[in-house]
């Protein structure tokens, strides 16, 4: 087992072996974000679902009210006047067959891919390169649409797509260490409400098993899910 650095050992010593109240947990994670860059704050949610069953899968989007603090490079696959609409709305890349061909060759200089429905038969052929990276456009995620301007605006403003992995765990970034504790709490509350609102129909037993939050380089802190659910929406 690799030896922990003095910095990590010191940070771990600050985290007690208990479940923290939401705001208290966020304040501790912020305090432990001591790297020389603005660390990303992440949530890791273990749910009582088995995604190998279609009625226990979770894939949706959340619009974080305080944004993510990160810029998102968006690529759009469409044709005709829609390409100009995409560029005007702020897409970094926009193309038709040429962009499909470039992606097929492994050129993936973007964080999010949006496509219009008419281009999906061609985009579907890119499943081998897009699928493993979680970049395949999907109507449920809002990344297959004819309203490109609205979609680009939402994702630039902090809308995120997330899904439960094969183990039923959701990993989502919800801000930066430079955010205020209240801003992070507002984002985390919105994430919790979104996960509850999109509970899979086949989920059985206890839905929320655990919620941990952490910064990029810091230790994780367990959050009291019930206390988070009980917070007022304008907490």
UniProtKB/Swiss-Prot annotation:
Q: Organism's domain of life?
A: Bacteria
UniProt entry tagged with the keyword rRNA-binding: yes
- Extract the coiled-coil ranges from the record: none
Q: Does the keyword Transferase apply?
A: no
One GO cellular-component annotation of the UniProt record comes to: large ribosomal subunit
Pfam short name (any one): Ribosomal_L1
Gene3D superfamilies, per database record:
3.30.190.20, 3.40.50.790
Q: Which GO terms describe its biological process?
A: regulation of translation; translation
Q: Which GO terms describe its molecular function?
A: rRNA binding; structural constituent of ribosome; tRNA binding
Q: Sorted alphabetically, which keywords does the UniProt record give? A: Repressor, Ribonucleoprotein, Ribosomal protein, RNA-binding, rRNA-binding, Translation regulation, tRNA-binding
Oligomeric state and partners? Part of the 50S ribosomal subunit.
Which family does the record claim for this protein? Belongs to the universal ribosomal protein uL1 family.
- What is this protein's function? Binds directly to 23S rRNA. The L1 stalk is quite mobile in the ribosome, and is involved in E site tRNA release. Protein L1 is also a translational repressor protein, it controls the translation of the L11 operon by binding to its mRNA.
Name it: Large ribosomal subunit protein uL1
- Tell me which species this is from: Prochlorococcus marinus (strain MIT 9313)
Gene designation: rplA
């Amino acid at each position: 087992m690799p030896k922990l650095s003095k910095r990590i050992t010191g940070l771990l010593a600050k985290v007690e072996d208990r479940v923290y109240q939401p705001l208290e947990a966020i304040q501790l994670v912020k305090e432990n974000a001591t790297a020389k860059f603005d660390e990303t704050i992440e949530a890791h949610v273990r749910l009582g679902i088995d995604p190998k069953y279609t009625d226990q899968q979770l894939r949706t989007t959340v619009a974080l009210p305080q944004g993510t603090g990160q810029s998102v490079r968006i690529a759009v696959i469409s044709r005709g006047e829609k390409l100009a609409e995409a560029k005007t709305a702020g897409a970094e890349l926009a193309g038709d067959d040429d962009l499909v061909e470039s992606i097929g060759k492994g050129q993936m200089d973007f964080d999010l891919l949006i496509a219009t429905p008419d281009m999906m038969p061609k985009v579907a052929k890119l499943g081998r390169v897009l699928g493993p990276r979680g970049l395949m456009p999907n109507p449920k995620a809002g990344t297959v649409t004819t309203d490109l301007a609205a979609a680009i605006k939402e994702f630039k403003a902090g809308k995120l797509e997330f899904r439960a992995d094969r183990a039923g765990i959701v990993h989502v970034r919800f801000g930066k260490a430079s955010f205020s504790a209240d801003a992070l709490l507002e984002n985390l509350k919105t994430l919790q409400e979104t996960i509850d609102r999109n509970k899979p129909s086949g989920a059985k037993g206890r839905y929320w098993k655990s919620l941990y939050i952490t910064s990029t380089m810091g230790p994780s802190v367990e959050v009291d899910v019930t206390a988070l659910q009980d917070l007022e929406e304008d907490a």
